[in-house]
Amino acid sequence: MDDIETAKNLTVKARTAYSVWDVCRLFIEMIAPDVDIDIESKRKSDELLFPGYVIRPMESLTTGRPYGLDSSAEDSSVSSDSSAEVILPAAKMVKERFDSIGNGMLSSQEASQAAIDLMLQNNKLLDNRKQLYKSIAIIIGRLPEKDKKRATEMLMRKMDCTQLLVPPAPTEEDVMKLVSVVTQLLTLVPPDRQAALIGDLFIPESLKDIFNSFNELAAENRLQQKKSELEGRTEVNHANTNEEVPSRRTRSRDTNARGAYKLQNTITEGPKAVPTKKRRVATRVRGRKSRNTSRV
């Protein structure tokens, strides 16, 4: 807070007009270290605003010396004439620059306190991310060679690997994603070695409960997956048993049984035969046939 108040009341009196963007850079580095601003191009634009003055980077707010310039060295390119001196209203110009990038952190006491709170939160996220990066490196380093390729593929699916080289400003979401990555990488470690490996990891204290919950959930999913695989194998074995080719004796016995079953069905359950009318067959009788006639 003292540094902010000092900067608000600061004026730069020098023959060399230091870029106000360097003052902005000091605040940005304090509040958001990961934010990358091209100070050099901003400095060149300020050279157009202050013609006749050499714009150089400011080393610090206290020394007021450019980078690489010894305090005892004299700048021959700058005249010692007092008329060449310029007073830059740093507080006003710094505020204008901050407003131009959508930031009004120096506008009030509450905003200054909010900037400090943001700085503390940012430092906490940076520390958490750093520890989780270490944990990821430890896990991958201890995996067998055959599993390192799978671990790399998992890492590339979950996050942009360019962020490992040039990390952006951290967020809560990014940190939680890293916790998820650590949990997934642990699934590649044999269960009997997980406990010892977890003890060597750098898990932030504030995230240990979440990490343990993620790890338990991953273990449950792993057990469920193994159970499903085991049930699938059992079903396959059962199907193979039913499809075995019977022996000759079994085939003969089954054939006889099927024949008896068909015969039984034909006798008992088949359609009943409809009785047909018997045809009278004429028989020849020798001699004259008697006539059965009754006379009245």
UniProtKB/Swiss-Prot annotation:
Compositional bias of kind Basic residues: 275-296
Location of the region described as Interaction with REP1 in the Swiss-Prot/TrEMBL record: 1-57
Keyword terms: Acetylation, Nucleus, Plasmid, Plasmid partition
Disordered: annotated segments: 228-296
Region (Nuclear localization): 276-296
DNA-binding, and self-association as annotated region, ranges: 58-296
Principal subcellular localization: nucleus
Gene Ontology annotations for the cellular component aspect, listed alphabetically: nucleus
Cellular location(s): Nucleus
One GO MF term: identical protein binding
Record PTM N-acetylmethionine, positions in chain: M1
GO term, biological process aspect, one: protein stabilization
More about this protein: The plasmid 2-micron circle is a extrachromosomal element that resides in the nucleus and propagates itself stably in host cell populations. It provides no obvious advantage to the host but imposes no significant disadvantage either at its steady-state copy number of 40-60 molecules/cell.
Subunit structure: Interacts with REP1.
Function statement: Part of the plasmid partitioning system, which ensures the equal distribution of replicated plasmid molecules to daughter cells. The plasmids exist as well-organized plasmid foci within the nucleus that stay together throughout the cell-cycle and act as entity during segregation, effetively reducing copy number to one. Plasmid partitioning requires the proteins REP1, REP2, and a cis-acting locus STB (REP3).
Protein name according to UniProt: Partitioning protein REP2
Lineage summary: Eukaryota, Fungi, Dikarya, Ascomycota, Saccharomycotina
